[in-house]
């Protein structure tokens, strides 16, 4: 009996060992954790638990690998879309090729322009402006009884007669244009500036020395070189202020 029981127990152990070995062989790809669980399990119930554990771990590992692959694929798609967007042309409406080339050429031409040319152009402009200022000779003109004075360019005139006509247009012409005023049935002609003062008005000028002189006492060239300002005065008030008034 003892021999039979010993042989029975030995056969049971051998069967259990075979089960453990077969479980270990079938679950060898799973890893160290599954091997540890198999070595601690005994019997068919332990074998079933071992297979269930192996199935769960394999399913979780496969799901994690799938999720990781999907994340990597999504990142690649996002990077590809960003690269395609950066390569697209921005702006609407689109610019034609020849227009774009012309714009580029214009930008290059403006960048390569000689700065000395711009400087010379500015210098020439300043010189022309200064020449115009020298060619023009403005003097102030006032008239007794009129608070507002005016300026006149003497270089625009060549003689005393032209100057007198311009001053008459400025100060003595009627406000209604060139028409004469009618008073008591008589036509009133505009007042003129006469050198002899017979019209009641005389044109005087102040020279560089500050003396008041009668316009027309010297040649036109000397007058242009010495005049500082002009004044239309009444003959009665001009006595004693101009040295050569008649």
Swiss-Prot record:
User: Which tissues and organs express this gene's product?
Assistant: Preferentially expressed in stems and flowers.
In the UniProt record, which is one GO cellular component term?
nucleus
Motif, EAR-like (transcriptional repression): chain positions: 36-40
Example GO biological process term?
regulation of DNA-templated transcription
Q: Where in the cell is it found?
A: Nucleus
Domain PB1, residue spans: 136-235
Which top-level group of life is the source organism from? Eukaryota
Subunit description: Homodimers and heterodimers. Interacts with TPL.
Protein purpose: Aux/IAA proteins are short-lived transcriptional factors that function as repressors of early auxin response genes at low auxin concentrations. Repression is thought to result from the interaction with auxin response factors (ARFs), proteins that bind to the auxin-responsive promoter element (AuxRE). Formation of heterodimers with ARF proteins may alter their ability to modulate early auxin response genes expression.
Note what the entry says on domains: The N-terminal half of the protein contains two conserved domains I and II. Domain I includes a slightly degenerated ERF-associated amphiphilic repression (EAR) motif which seems to be involved in the activity of transcriptional repression. Domain II is required for the correct degradation of the protein through the SCF-mediated ubiquitin-proteasome pathway. Interactions between Aux/IAA proteins and auxin response factors (ARFs) occur through their C-terminal dimerization domains III and IV.
Tell me which family the UniProt entry assigns to this protein.
Belongs to the Aux/IAA family.
Stated name of the protein: Auxin-responsive protein IAA11
- Please report the organism this UniProt entry assigns to the protein: Arabidopsis thaliana
Q: What is the primary gene name for this protein?
A: IAA11
